[in-house]
Amino acid sequence: MDEELDYLWETLGLEITADLWPERDKIHPTLRPAITVVQAKYRRASFLIMRMSWHAGLPDLKRIQASLVELSGMPTVISEAHLEQRQRERLQQQRIPFICPGVQAYLPFMDEEYWSGKPN
């Protein structure tokens, strides 16, 4: 998750710390090997960042993100390097947080909605 944290620091100036999510055993056993989940902290906010080990489609990402929100009770950010502009727009319309390192970050649960973008 260093790429995501570096991007948030270098682009937005957000100094976020993160460690592996301590409640990882709540993730379904068949999904556990395919997902990395860290618990991130920024100021007083605590949230999860999830990244799949393969390029998952948007419906799968949204389904897994929703289940992690339910399991953890925390906002959960999707990290995916290959989101197309229309996919990012769709996530924003649905207020689903995401990081597309080097392109855009959308974190609506923070005090402000941080985002930065470069055209595709």
Model-derived regions, located:
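N-terminal intrinsically disordered, cationic/polar leader segments
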Residues: E112, S116-P119
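Short secondary-structure boundary/hinge segments and terminal tails
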Residues: Q87, P108-M110
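DNA-contacting interfaces and partner/effector-binding or oligomerization modules
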Residues: M1-I96
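Charged, structured surface patches that assemble and position nucleic-acid processing machinery
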Residues: R95-L107
